Structures are given as structure tokens and as C-alpha cells.
Amino acid sequence: MELLDSRMDFQGCKIALICGDKVLTILRDDKENIPWPNMWELPGGGREGDESPFECAAREVYEELGIHLTEDCLLWSKVYPSMLYEGRQSVFMVGQLRHEQFDNITFGDEGQAYKLMLIEEFLKSKQAVPQLQGRLRDYLEENYDKT
């Protein structure tokens, strides 16, 4: 699986952690010097060293929320253009989050708050990072809109 391949060239990862009909979101810091200040986003961040996409996502989720992810939680992934670096790519993943993982979150020092938000609310919010809304929508359309 390419998510485990550290030779893949990518800038960073974001992961939508889904628990029932909700997604785990983080309210970004309200600082003018960061992209998308005071907006709801998904866990993740920049690659360190030669991490694989999964290693990058797992490290970021642990740093931001104290959650240990295992590879078996992954449901989907897709490579997209980087949100920050033109001409580079990033990886978007979707994984399952168990209620007990949410209940045991240890919130890190990035962001103002976290919450399990209804997926529909995240997709419609004017206060959510638009690129992440689109990427989550891609997953849902590919996996659930099979009418």
C-alpha cells in the first residue's frame, strides 16, 4: 500500500477520522500569520524526514490529539495537490475513530478546540477549510453515493 511507502514524494497529510456520522475536527488558532486562521480543519500536517504518508498522519494525530492510530483504521486515501506548496502533493486519508479514542483525547498545543462535528455540518460550514471539505466530499461521493 502506497500509504506505507516512505519513498513516496509528498509534503504532508490530513486525515478525516470518522466516528459514526461525525468527523473529528480542530479549530485552528486565531493568528493572522497562519493559513486559515480560526477555521475548522482536520488533523494532520507536514512530513518530517522520510516518513510514509501513514507515519506522517499517525505522528500528527498523536501530537495534536494524543490518539494512537493503527494502519487497520484506514478506509481510503488519495493524493491531491498540496494546499500550501504549488507543484507539490499531499495525501488525504479517511480513517475510523472509535468512541473510546475520542473519550481519551489529550489536546495538544496547536489549535483552540476540537470536536466531533456532524459530517454534514463540516461540509456546509463557512468556517471550515474549503479544500478539506472538498476532499471529504470526494470520499463520500466515491463510497456512499452509489444510487
Each language-model region and where it sits:
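Short, solvent-exposed loop/helix junctions and linker helices
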Residues: 9, 47-51, 126
